[in-house]
A protein has these predicted regions:
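Membrane-embedded helix-loop-helix hairpins and adjacent transmembrane boundary segments
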Residues: 1-484
């Protein structure tokens, strides 16, 4: 009952924020870009929660057991990726005054490239958001609501409905402020869970440092194994490109940046936001080491799945009942902050890129937007329930793989537009964008079978390179399309 009351109180605060921030809004410009009035420091803080999903909240501490602290190599790459986004992509988006960032592809390459970029974003975001929300709903069902005999589908529908309620009228500026609250709750939950873990271990500060340093899982850098997915250069450069495509080429993440007052504030937001990932992910990994140490001290058998380590400690009371409340708040905050912005960004992409509502009257555009927002919410709930019906871990993995593969063509198309002075044949763009991920999948399967080499995130770079090469092959020298 305490968990249910916590969730209801949390949602009530979200509704209050939505009501306050949406009081003077309602226009399409406000919904899509917040009338360019969002304070950069609020956007920066809130974007942390939007990037850290519920999956991250439970997965990063657990991944320590399987790959030590080598994830920090990727996190370091993230920071340099954010610098690329701040100094190459953000100036472009502000110069063109874009609502949807894929409008650049239409201006630079052609209408089919524009539609293709938007389609790949929608596919990736819908599948990725459904998979993330599924795992969060599953955790809530297993550890919180199962005793109340609440069916999974009701949790899924309820979660999406809650997000729809406070986003369907309240615009991107509401998302900016609700994400700020949710980021605060997420970070507070993480810090308090670490605190209770340290209490159980009965450690002072020097003891904490010593426990982490002496752990067999404290390794961060891997320079000596080129085959391993944890090799430094694979992880570091993959981190750079992951940020470029999953932040810089993602409507969800860029929409908040475009709601800032000007380019300079958006860049400051990106600097602070990018740097904050380093200490935050380090804390998640340290929590993982401390939980493993606590399991050894208490002689507990850890679950087979790494993702179940933190939920086990929280749900079974090993850290006290307060941690279960904190864990629930952290999961809900991470899930909502990721899903609300994704739903708003998908609505923007469908309305602006596919339905071209910017040419409609204000009232017509608003009606279309409301219908699209509701339809996408229903579709999201359907996909979450579909994954539950299939109930197959390999299906969830496949969804993540498909979602990640769809960013490669976006990388290739934007790279072609930014770094070449050629015009490609626009009608071939959809085919090239489809073939590139398929070739990557076959290459991953064949090379793994023949040589044992394991592709990691570098598949993203290969995918983008293939798309880039395909566009080059279908292009000719000449003047580029005129870009404002």
């Amino acid at each position: 009952m305490m968990i249910l009351v916590t969730i209801l109180c949390y949602f009530a605060v979200l509704l209050l924020i939505a009501r306050i921030t949406g009081r003077k809004g309602g226009s399409n410009a406000a919904f899509f870009k917040g009338e360019n009035q969002s304070p950069w420091y609020i956007v920066s803080f809130g974007m942390i929660g939007a990037s850290i999903s519920g999956v991250t909240f439970v997965s990063v501490p657990g991944m320590v057991r399987g790959m030590d602290m080598t994830y920090m190599q990727t996190v370091l790459g993230f920071f340099f990726g954010y610098m690329v986004v701040a100094h190459i992509l953000l100036p472009l988006y502000y110069k063109l005054n874009l609502t949807s960032i894929y409008g650049y592809l239409g201006t630079r390459i052609g209408v089919r490239a524009y539609r293709t970029g938007s389609f790949f974003f929608l596919l990736s975001r819908m599948l990725g958001t459904a998979a993330k929300l599924y795992l969060v709903c599953l955790i809530l069902h297993t550890y919180v609501f199962q005793e109340m005999h609440v069916p999974f589908w009701l949790i899924a529908v309820g979660s999406v409905a809650l997000v729809w309620i406070y986003t369907h009228k309240s615009e991107i500026k509401t998302i900016v402020w609700t994400d700020t609250l949710q980021t605060f709750c997420l970070i507070a939950a993480l810090i308090f869970i670490i605190y209770f873990t340290i209490q159980r271990l009965d450690l002072n500060f020097s003891g904490i440092v010593q426990t982490i340093q002496n752990s067999e899982h404290s390794r961060i850098f891997v320079f000596d194994d080129w085959v391993s997915r944890q090799n430094f250069f694979k992880q570091f450069f993959s981190g750079i490109f992951i940020v470029i495509v999953m932040t810089g080429l993602d409507q969800d993440m860029m929409q908040k940046n475009l709601s800032c007052r000007n380019l300079q504030e958006a860049q400051k937001n990106m600097y602070c936001y990018g740097f904050s990932f380093i200490p935050l992910n380090f804390l998640f990994l340290c929590l993982g080491i401390l939980l493993i140490a606590l399991a050894g001290q208490m002689q507990l058998e850890l679950p087979a799945m790494n993702d179940d380590i933190l939920p086990m400690f929280a749900a079974q009371g090993y850290l006290g009942q307060s941690v279960l409340v904190l864990f629930t708040i952290g999961i809900i905050a991470a899930a909502f902050s990721n899903s609300d912005s994704a739903l708003t960004a998908m609505t923007t992409s469908v309305c602006v890129d596919l339905l071209n509502t910017e040419k409609d009257t204000e009232e017509t555009a608003r009606r279309k937007r409301s219908k699209v927002h509701l339809s996408l919410s229903v579709l999201l709930a359907f996909f979450i329930c579909l994954v539950e019906i299939l109930n197959n871990k390999s299906v969830i993995d496949a969804i993540y793989i498909i979602a990640s593969y769809t960013y490669g063509p976006l990388l290739g198309m934007f790279a072609f537009g930014l770094f070449t002075r050629r015009q490609t044949n626009d009608r071939w763009v959809p085919l090239i964008a489809i073939l590139s991920p398929l070739i990557c999948y076959l290459a991953d399967w064949w090379i793994g079978k023949e040589t044992g080499y394991k592709f990691g995130y570098e598949l993203l770079m290969l995918n983008g390179t293939l798309t880039f090469a395909g566009l080059i092959c279908m292009s000719k020298k000449g003047k580029t399309l005129k870009v404002p």
